[in-house]
């Protein structure tokens, strides 16, 4: 019996020339941001669902229709992060009391949308520079 191994619908691999372009963009982004003393951060792909709901907004399409969330062993609802704002806000709230905090990040985000050309369930998000002092 032949097994069909394929991508999950709405996802894609990045490789070859497309990967080279992607790496170039990421490198330029970090280079420019570092010139302005922004610090990079890597946050978990999983977040508490209520955190995302509060920071993004309960009534937004992201929370009401597009978020991948599930009950984690009957303890709490968690989700695959749909964007970076919630993770950056959580980090800032729990790690900094005062002062200037300039953070940047990039990484995979997940949205349950109807797949179509150019729109994927898994996307790479490059955060805009975050400045909680503004």
PLM region spans:
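Single conserved hydrophobic/aromatic residue that forms the stacking wall/gate
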Residues: 125-134
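A surface-exposed, charged beta-strand/loop segment in the N-terminal or early-internal portion
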Residues: 86, 109, 119
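Beta-strand scaffold of nucleotide-dependent catalytic cores
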Residues: 104-107, 115
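Cofactor- and metal-binding active-site motifs of prokaryotic enzymes
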Residues: 84, 108, 124
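TRNA-binding/sensing appendages of the translation machinery
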Residues: 1-82, 86, 94
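Short glycine/proline-enriched loop/turn "hinge" motifs that connect secondary-structure elements
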Residues: 115-122
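A residue-level signal for conserved active-site and pocket-lining positions in enzyme catalytic cores
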Residues: 33, 88, 106, 128
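Short secondary-structure capping/junction motifs at helix and strand boundaries
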Residues: 38, 97-104
């Amino acid at each position: 019996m032949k097994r069909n191994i394929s991508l999950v619908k709405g996802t894609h691999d990045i490789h070859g020339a497309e990967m080279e372009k992607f790496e170039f963009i990421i490198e330029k982004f970090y280079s420019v941001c570092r010139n302005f003393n922004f610090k990079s951060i890597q946050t978990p792909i999983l977040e508490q669902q209520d955190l995302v709901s509060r920071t993004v907004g309960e009534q937004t399409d992201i929370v009401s229709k597009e978020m991948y969330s599930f009950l984690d062993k009957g303890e709490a609802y968690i989700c695959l992060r749909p964007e970076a704002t919630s993770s950056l806000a959580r980090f800032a709230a729990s790690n900094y009391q005062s002062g200037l905090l300039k953070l940047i990040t990039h990484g995979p985000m997940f949205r349950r949308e109807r797949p179509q050309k150019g729109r994927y369930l898994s996307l790479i998000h490059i955060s805009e520079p975050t400045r909680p002092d503004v």
